[in-house]
């Protein structure tokens, strides 16, 4: 086993990478509230795992979506647990994200030279809210349907571009199959990809600049 490790160590310098990760300086003022961002990341990873598991059974059509969710909850092995964990971790992710934003703001973590870290964090907060909006509609029950209808109808108040924007969100002039397909694609592919990219940027900047000092 040691020969295998030595072979990889010689080529990749694994020990040097591990030392760099574990030897990062942590300021003495850091407390449990500085862990909120990491907890948010953990919730996101749980979301990815449980969401991926549900894609094996969920059917993104207006005629089968609700029935497929019922199947997950009542027939699929541990489906009820997987969906419940998905919902609980979604709520936890939103809560931890809000608390994290407040902590950073109140401790001045957005100030120079960490402005870009703050910007990427705000973008991640918007993406988190978008997860909630798109995921809420996927069961395609009465609550989900009317939530989509209201949310996609909001931009109509914008002059000139309002109506085209509503049609772009819905995929047609009314809420239907095209809308569900769009929201499913956003929820399972576009938003996770964007979130992963901005999280990588966010954590890379934190690693580079370190944790902000006390007020």
From Swiss-Prot:
Under the heading InterPro entries, the entry gives:
Cyt_b/b6_N, Cyt_B6_PetB, Cytb/b6-like_sf, Cytochrome_b_N_euk/bac, Di-haem_cyt_TM
Q: How does it assemble?
A: The 4 large subunits of the cytochrome b6-f complex are cytochrome b6, subunit IV (17 kDa polypeptide, PetD), cytochrome f and the Rieske protein, while the 4 small subunits are PetG, PetL, PetM and PetN. The complex functions as a dimer.
The answer to whether UniProt assigns keyword Plastid to this entry is yes
Q: Which UniProt keywords apply?
A: Chloroplast, Electron transport, Heme, Iron, Membrane, Metal-binding, Photosynthesis, Plastid, Thylakoid, Transmembrane, Transmembrane helix, Transport
Q: How is the cofactor bound?
A: Binds 2 heme b groups non-covalently with two histidine residues as axial ligands.
| Name recorded for this polypeptide | Cytochrome b6
Q: What family is it from?
A: Belongs to the cytochrome b family. PetB subfamily.
* A GO-annotated cellular component: chloroplast thylakoid membrane
Residues recorded as binding heme b 2, renumbered to this chain, are: 86, 187
Gene of this entry = petB
UniProt GO BP: photosynthesis; respiratory electron transport chain
Function summary: Component of the cytochrome b6-f complex, which mediates electron transfer between photosystem II (PSII) and photosystem I (PSI), cyclic electron flow around PSI, and state transitions.
One GO MF term? metal ion binding
Report TM segments: 32-52, 90-110, 116-136, 186-206
Q: Which Pfam families match?
A: Cytochrome_B (PF00033)
Annotated localization: Plastid, Chloroplast thylakoid membrane
Q: What is the lineage of its organism?
A: Eukaryota, Viridiplantae, Streptophyta, Embryophyta, Tracheophyta
Query: What topology does it adopt in the membrane?
Result: Multi-pass membrane protein
Give the binding site residues for heme c. Answer: 35
Cofactors needed by this protein, per the record, are: heme b; heme c
Additional notes on this entry? Heme 1 (or BH or b566) is high-potential and absorbs at about 566 nm, and heme 2 (or BL or b562) is low-potential and absorbs at about 562 nm.
Which residues are noted in the entry as heme b 1-binding? Answer: 100, 202
């Amino acid at each position: 086993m040691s020969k295998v490790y030595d072979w990889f160590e010689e080529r990749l310098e694994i020990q040097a990478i591990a030392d760099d990760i574990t030897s990062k300086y942590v300021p003495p003022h850091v407390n449990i509230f500085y862990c909120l961002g990491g907890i948010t990341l953990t919730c996101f990873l749980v979301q990815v795992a449980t969401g991926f598991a549900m894609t094996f059974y969920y059917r993104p059509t207006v005629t089968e979506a609700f029935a497929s969710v019922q199947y997950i909850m009542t027939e699929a092995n541990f489906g009820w647990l997987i969906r419940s964990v998905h919902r609980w971790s979604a709520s936890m992710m939103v809560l931890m994200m809000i608390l994290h934003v407040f902590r950073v703001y109140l401790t001045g973590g957005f100030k120079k030279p960490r402005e870009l870290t703050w910007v990427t964090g705000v973008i991640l907060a918007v993406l988190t809210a978008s997860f909630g909006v798109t995921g809420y509609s996927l069961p395609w029950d009465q609550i989900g349907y009317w939530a989509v209808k209201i949310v996609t109808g909001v931009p109509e108040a914008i002059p000139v571009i309002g109506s085209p924007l509503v049609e772009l969100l819905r995929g047609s002039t009314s809420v239907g199959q095209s809308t569900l397909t769009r929201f499913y694609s956003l929820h399972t592919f576009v938003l996770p990809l964007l979130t992963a990219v901005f999280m990588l940027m966010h954590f890379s900047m934190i690693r580079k600049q370190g944790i902000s000092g006390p007020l």
